[in-house]
């Protein structure tokens, strides 16, 4: 190839793609050619990719950049997972799962970023809050996927898909080059056909840039699941459909029903497409392991409300346009084509051929309790010096017979693993194992005497055509005292947590902690067990929620306490502050108000989604009215009141840090942040724009409009006047008018969403810490005053207990072994019990998967891991 040709080709590729020219001699080893990927095919067909996402393989033959990023729980460090490079016998191009396994050994990892391989920078990251979402992480962020929950085989090698459980989702609300309005666009994805539910909405594709429901036709994505409130196929599903906002659409009918003649999908791996253009859309689907795609629907738009479409261009994965995130599913690869392109059926069939050639298959190796081979819990809990039967299963996904399959388990120092009923540490199957069949061996695993959180490692080695190959897999284990979170209650006058010692020996709980984490809130504290606390064998330990607790720390010399609750308290009552050796007793001198409902520091969309207010600030933007996702409705704060400003978060938000409050005094309460829409088309050159709601917009506000795409452009405008009436925030309200400082540079469509930060809450003194979007803003109220100052300081959530109160807190019987002051138990949350060294002893989620890593039990398709 000449230099001129090399340069010509290189100019058509993203910057992360490399063409490497090698001078080879006559007998040199030349790696196998990496075949063209789906995005090469789309480009050749005239519909190049504008977004290309996969955790399993490169979607271009020449792509050598990162596929995704993982972050580990133990220290917050991150690692980009790239593609395996070619070797003499291997074309490479699949994900480097071994790098992830090494980096994430003995801890948990999250997928923080799914990189865009197209070169347009359309990476997918943690989905921000939205009104239809289950608020999981601080302020309403979605949870991130756990990195190893979806193992598979691709191109004969291990890789991991993106596993979505309810509450999880990835998104990009500020994309580049995606279709907007009625522009054409194509999409495809490969998913697990056995992992789905009827919750909304397991989608991939084009959504709203404000993570809200902006009306019919404001999104167009693929959808997979068996939801029935909208268009749907015959029961029980699942079906390949699309999501076009306020409608899951599998077809368009003429008889007034929403019953579609769609096939019930039974394939383990599924390819699906969703292509839309003016007046027309088409969906196709097929078995990702064999054959061609079939037409699911090819015809007109649903109704005039969807024709023309009003797409906005955001990119979402695993959730809906309004962040509805109640879905289950697993994504392996996906892509969107450029604005104004409509892939032909021939192009989509070639993409399907590329998917089939990638040879997706179930995981080759699993490590599970013997009793749960098909539904592995992902975690086994031992007590020191105990034994359990653990099974290693090898499934031949090579496509040819293999021989000499050897299975074993690698264990932590001080542990042992032997074949059940024998003394050997491995088991070998000499005869051929046919493609698609499995062999397994069960081992007696005995834990050591030392407490441990980490991995068991399952090993397999086999021979193919005289070549020995191997693979490993892991299972999380805990080797800890047999203390269980036995039961709890979330009742205003009966909130408690009970521990149980399932062992035959007493256990010392000195300096253990229990972290109770309410959904959508950061973690501020843990319940601490005092020195000398022992839990008898087969005994119970009861933690009771006190009628009140500190919402911010109290300092030595303070006479005012800011508390969670004052209901039932009376002047003159004796109260206890804290517990154990730290307890102080005082009388109540006066009672004013308890802490109010928190809101969050404003999260702007589509710009943002995280803004940081620097040290030295005296004003913060805030979420008004509804109180944000951290505290529900009812947020109110007044001049002169104390306000707690949360700080200490890290991003992405995974509830892996401890939050704190700094306390300020409010000096002014001005306009909150707001999200609203253009009320009519705005044209380049205009110096006024019509908007739905001007109530919280002020002179001087800067507004970011639109996205960077074909016939559209991003620009920042400055408001110089706010004229006429308030639109009331609704779509039917009378619009208001904004006068702007300079003429518009681009055209912008009616219904375009935008955000305004507002003039915020002012306070003194200036901040000594930085504060970021979605961190809590807590009105502290006026608190209660004491008859004398405190003799020592007390931490946030320390007990404030008034024995005379019967209307709040745990009332018994029986009396608790220990009181705790907060946080109050919520309707959803997680609990994590740790020993004195910080090892996790027990954990659970309730009311939702608030902290996925703390989940115990099988997470996956109802039909099992290998089906």
How should each PLM-predicted stretch be described?
Residues 36-39, 533-796, 800-805:
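Autoprocessing Asn-cyclization modules and mimics
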Residues 474-520, 546, 570, 580, ...:
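A structural motif detector for short, solvent-exposed N-terminal "entry" segments of globular domains
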Residues 432, 446-452:
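Short, surface-exposed loop/turn segments at beta-strand-coil junctions that are enriched for proline
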Residues 375-386, 489-491:
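Short, solvent-exposed loop/linker segments at the N-terminal edge
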Residues 400-404, 504-510, 841:
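Short acidic/proline- and small/hydrophobic-mixed sequence motifs that coincide with surface turns
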Residues 385-400, 492-505:
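Short beta-strand elements of extracellular/lumenal beta-sandwich folds
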Residues 32-49, 58, 62, 73-75, ...:
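Extracellular glycan-associated modules
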Residues 30-137, 188, 356-359, 484, ...:
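GGW-centered surface loops in extracellular recognition modules
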